[in-house]
Amino acid sequence: MTLTIDTSTPESRALLRPDPTVEKKPLIGLSREEMAQALASIGVPERQVNMRVRQLWHWLYVRGVSDFSRMFNISKELRAKLDEHFTIARPEIVEEQISQDGTRKWLLRFPPRGAGRPVEVETVYIPEEDRGTLCISSQVGCTLTCSFCHTGTQKMVRNLTAGEILDQLLIARDRLGDFPDADTPDGAIVPAEGRKITNIVMMGMGEPLYNFENVKQALLVASDGDGLSLSKRRITLSTSGVVPEIYRTGEEIGIMLAISLHAVRDELRNELVPINKKYPLKDLLDACRAYPGLSNARRITFEYVMLKGVNDSLDDARELVRLLKGIPAKINLIPFNPWPGSAYECSDWEQIEKFAELVNRAGYASPIRTPRGRDILAACGQLKSASERMKKTERLKLEAMMIAGHGD
């Protein structure tokens, strides 16, 4: 039986066009296996699939293209078919702010994916002479409500997909001229030589281990040697202490680990970092001691925000040293970054230095983090997107969808 398709009239031809209201499937963030399945689904011959995956991977993650028409070694016919079914477009940049110290913050807008309206996240680039660090978000909002953190005052909206996590890296490389044949913007502060983005830290909005599968997939793509090729030793994931997923992070991703510690006694940490009520200090530190590959060259970073009169006494410093005994560690002391409505103050500089000296004498590196991007609310603990303005009815609708298993 032969099927004949009528293309003689504009109306019949219109029926063959893709429905513009149907979202195209993003290719960014797919694993090689998923990309192969996607290509097979649109009729790419089986014998060609692996070759086409290699070509796409190179164009997306080595060359950094965001338009199928630029993939010159792929036939025009296949490029048209890819464009019909898939998207590799970058998210919208709503705003770009540049701090006096060269720190850059981008507000990015992503599709609703069940949230009722588009959502926004913030991504921050911190340049130094010998490195450029990109701080990436994993969620829109956060569930943890840490009392000193601005992001924690924004209710959870949704998880980011693996592609949306990677999009933040791709956007930053676009804007900094970090792909081949691209130009660095005039006046941009970037490392003296080599890559503009040398390190990424999962320290933006959200708790990455509450979005484990998407974060895992994004970081495995980012560290793939045939693409973006970031060393796993230059990727750090920061968690407030989701203990079961700390074990999984070490086994399944193998990147560097940072712990948002901030207190040395359960009573205070319960207040500052409420997840401590579920995973107290002993359980958290046991997971740290078991993290694979620990050595003096591969240490866990413990982040400790300095809050005046709250957690900054020398007794706190001594207890910190005692708690971390036997863990190859570095302790980042973070001067508290103020934000509107916060109930805390930053410790006096003299007290921070005394705290650091005591910890350092015990054998732990204890750098005091230089505040970056404070003037554009891009510093640690200051990120909060405009998605917080989502109407209550829209948020409740999203929460119902997530409970039902339809949200991302």
Curated annotation (Swiss-Prot):
One of its GO terms (cellular component) is cytoplasm. Keywords: 4Fe-4S, Cytoplasm, Disulfide bond, Iron, Iron-sulfur, Metal-binding, Methyltransferase, rRNA processing, S-adenosyl-L-methionine, Transferase, tRNA processing. It is found in: Cytoplasm. Residues 128-369 form the Radical SAM core domain. GO terms for biological process: rRNA base methylation; tRNA methylation. [4Fe-4S] cluster binds at C142, C146, C149. Its cofactor is [4Fe-4S] cluster. It catalyses: adenosine(2503) in 23S rRNA + 2 reduced [2Fe-2S]-[ferredoxin] + 2 S-adenosyl-L-methionine = 2-methyladenosine(2503) in 23S rRNA + 5'-deoxyadenosine + L-methionine + 2 oxidized [2Fe-2S]-[ferredoxin] + S-adenosyl-L-homocysteine; adenosine(37) in tRNA + 2 reduced [2Fe-2S]-[ferredoxin] + 2 S-adenosyl-L-methionine = 2-methyladenosine(37) in tRNA + 5'-deoxyadenosine + L-methionine + 2 oxidized [2Fe-2S]-[ferredoxin] + S-adenosyl-L-homocysteine. Binds 1 [4Fe-4S] cluster. The cluster is coordinated with 3 cysteines and an exchangeable S-adenosyl-L-methionine. Disulfide bonds join C135-C380. GO terms for molecular function: 4 iron, 4 sulfur cluster binding; metal ion binding; rRNA (adenine(2503)-C2-)-methyltransferase activity; rRNA binding; tRNA (adenine(37)-C2)-methyltransferase activity; tRNA binding. The keyword Cytoplasm applies. Its EC number is 2.1.1.192. NCBIfam families: rRNA_mod_RlmN (TIGR00048). Belongs to the radical SAM superfamily. RlmN family. This is Dual-specificity RNA methyltransferase RlmN. It comes from Chelativorans sp. (strain BNC1).
